[in-house]
């Protein structure tokens, strides 16, 4: 077990995937640490502006901006497509980009903001997600993705927890592939 309860689930030269239990939740939290060999500006383009799904996230069905506060802050509404027989979920996020010039780290934080958008036909889930990009050199960086989701509804945490690492691995692989193609 690593610091703060993180357990290494998968490791390669460029990707490390972790999981850990979260107090007061039946769903695990996941983390990816990814060494990226591309310019940070190219990597940041992969996060879009909230107006559509990120190309590299396979479960995203739709996404749109509800309210843009500034270039660094907005509210977004997203729907994820879950495998049958699980029903799709929707999310309302507060999205905030911050930059720490000392550590050369840019962080995109997504946190629940359910109160600003009405309930829909989908089961409302909540998630806390962080994407941090730390610049190492002009052409390399480390991306750290941390996420924890409360899926809501009647869904088996055991089943969901069993696929979260594989789903994160797929998304990371998709991101790396897109970066190579650009």
Protein language model features and the residues they cover:
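Eukaryotic helix-grip
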Residues: 1-182
